[in-house]
Amino acid sequence: MWESESESHGGERGLVPVGGGGGSGRHEAALKNDGFVRRDRSWYVNSDIPSDLLVKVGDVNFYLHKYPMISRSGRMSRAVYESSAADEAEADAAAAVAVVEMGDLPGGAGSFELAARFSYGMAVDLTAANISGLRCAAEYLEMTEEMEEGNLIFKTEAFLSYVVLSSWRDSIAVLKSCEALSPWAENLQIVRRCSESIAWKACANPRGVRWAYTGAGAGSGGARGGPAAIRGGGGSGGTASPRWNVGGGGGGESKESSPSRQAVPPADWWFEDVSVLRIDHFVRVVTAIKVKGMRFDLIGAAITHYASKWLPGLTKDAPLGATHDEPWAQASAAGVGGGGLHMMIISGAGGGKDDVLAACSAPSREQRMVVESIISITPPQRDSVSCGFLLRLLRLAIMLRAAPALVTELEKRVGMQLEQAALADLLIPSYGGRAADTAYDVDLVQRLVEHFLVQEQTEMAVASSPGRGDPPPPPQPEYYSGRMPPSSAAAASASASTGGLNAKARVARLLDSYLSEVSRDRNLSLTKFQVLAESLPESARACDDGLYRAVDSYLKAHPTLTEHERKRLCRVMDCQKLSFDACMHAAQNERLPLRVVVQVLFTEQVKISNALASSSAALRSSSSAPGADAAPAMPTTRRQLLDGTPQSFQEGWAAAKKDINTLKFELESMKAKYLELQHEMDALQKQVDGRGGGAPSPAAAKIGKQQQQGTSASAWSSGWKKLGRLAKMSGADAAAGGGVAPPGGGEAAARKGPRRWRNSIS
């Protein structure tokens, strides 16, 4: 069993006694110090000997003595020597006060105070809050074993290795305190060792963790996210550190605290604790956890939890703005050393795109670093994080202008699971800044659909191919070989195909909803709409009602489209895939081209004819089969079929039939007028040609001469041909008696009729 040392070794923890070396013992005994006293911004030593060393650390002054400091600090020894050499001109150099400035000392005045207390032989209380700063200060002051045995570097290293790294909570607190100690904490491997310790404990079996961590709400452990102070004395330190049991029960463990009597913590017990870390330290922890082989879905859940704390805009209901209750503000207030990264994500809902970018210009570097770091550590496996989280992260990355390579990688990950997306997450504004830009980034959605199709094709190819690089199967039973039987392989391929079709259908519905939403934008060009609508294959949509709704919305928002553009727009949908309600709406839609309306009506007529044919065939088959008398009666006529349809169908069909009858009446009227005009032309031609072979009149002879010269006769013949082409459309109905018969038609008219009909056809 290994557990927090604050409870098992509380009497020895944190108390650093006077050094065991004899080099400075006589100086410490002569000083007769009673401790340090602070006055305003200065520290003094309670001693009978006057101070001869002034150390300035920032804006704090320390009035000390030379010999206790130079006996344990190599850097202090050199600094005092250089200061004394500068005062050689004075008569009594030994009595002069040496002034040493250490403005760049890691840990600041607090760490130097502890180092000075240690140099004077006072007991120093080591805690998880001050150990990292004191370790860096000891390295800065060069308090090595060469100066004195058991020096400060040795003791702080021992405390880190045997106390801090064995405790979960202390490792978190020390790593949090390292935020203000760069690059010293990095160079001394404190960050690496704490990250690996946290990763090792996070990957351990949860059954070895007692239910006593901050995520479960420890009672007296202090503020959540702050370091736990570990003081010497009894075992009542009150820390929130979890206890760990890696092999059976320990000797000092009570029955009440045995793992069998404790509830097993969930797999996400460590999410809340690591979420207080700064982004660079969180990346180090997650990287170490990946190396140790944790499940990618748990890693993705931890990243999502961390991002929801530091980037409130990534949650569905939270606004894209920081408040005073954000976790980074709590962490900086309860943590050690400051260094908390304050985030401010500005939403684009309150102003224009330029205002958003201007508001993000000041903290954009820190925000961009957080977003890019989260993108880089997100597991690449499918379903490691939700598609909604990826889309919201993509929105922030575009708004903050993250690295293009990371944005492209994030788009590919979204495309891998695009069928899981929601319309609200897909409506990403366009942050181009130009007035002609569309309200939403349509090009981004086009790229997401392309990534989705590429992923689908890759999965289909992998599922259908048997593996070219595999060795030939050995001559043994099939269940011993690593290959899948042909039947199983075919079943897997069919399952992959079915899943791909279902995913494409969901993406098609999502895309139709997206098109209906963005079609209201007047700046959306017809080309972009058409390309996005045709990005999916035809097999992805079983019904084009959603696409028709988007087309109708686009026509409503763009009333200035030409007839050619309307026809081009309507080509994106298939009239044969429209439902009955959509067909009835399209038949009465004045915004659609007339040709599309006719095509819709014809398609519906074909459907009705096919239904009648199938009903008749079913009736004949049922009548010929045995027991046909018991079969229900099937509709045999169109009237019977319409009587069995809903009332909405009958009303819509009646309106459409009324329009068709009106068109037929107008066509019959035009036929009658044409036949009347044709009769008058025949009568005029008879007058010109003469009757019964008599001598033509002078006027008729003149007209015949003009016909021979090809002057006015050509005009008559050209007019005749034009009218003949018009008669070509209705000649069959006129011949059948559907039109109005020409009044007074004689034998000559009947004789010349076939000739004129042939001319009209030619």
Swiss-Prot record:
UniProt keywords, alphabetically: Coiled coil, Ubl conjugation pathway
Coiled coil ranges: 654-691
Record domain NPH3: where: 268-607
Domain BTB intervals: 51-128
Membrane-crossing residue ranges in chain numbering: none
Xref: SUPFAM superfamilies: POZ domain (SSF54695)
Domain writeup: The BTB/POZ domain mediates the interaction with some component of ubiquitin ligase complexes.
Name the record gives this protein: Coleoptile phototropism protein 1
Organism annotation: Oryza sativa subsp. japonica
